[in-house]
Amino acid sequence: MYNPKNKTSANSKGGESVESARMFNIINKLRFLMISCRIEARLSLDEACKLIQVDKKKSAHFFADSILRTLDEALGKPLVLRLPGEKSYSFDEKWLARLITSFRNKDHINIKFLLNSRVENLNKRSYIYFLIEGLSQDIDSL
């Protein structure tokens, strides 16, 4: 699993720096996307998932945009993302990085733990699961 504190992956031995650089790039792209999301209208989790259901071949960019525009609702508080390029991670970014890594590793126990620890509402939890899973399936195109 990805550890943002020391930027390593516990599952890899030789590719730790590659995985940490890869996750930093993903989080940094999400930071850039968040800047544009702030000027767009808020979107409910329900609306975001319905839009994706119309075209299930949506890109990772669309999933990421939907996540960033709805995560405030799911968490019950504003999402904290640092400015693009910053080396330190916010608590929300660490949580998101761990969640993405867990999806990529198909670590369902950790996925459940991470979602249960931050998203109280069961319906919202399932929406976030759907969105993060969609993002992680095509994350390299982000």
What are these regions (language model features)?
Residues 1-142:
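C-terminal-biased regions
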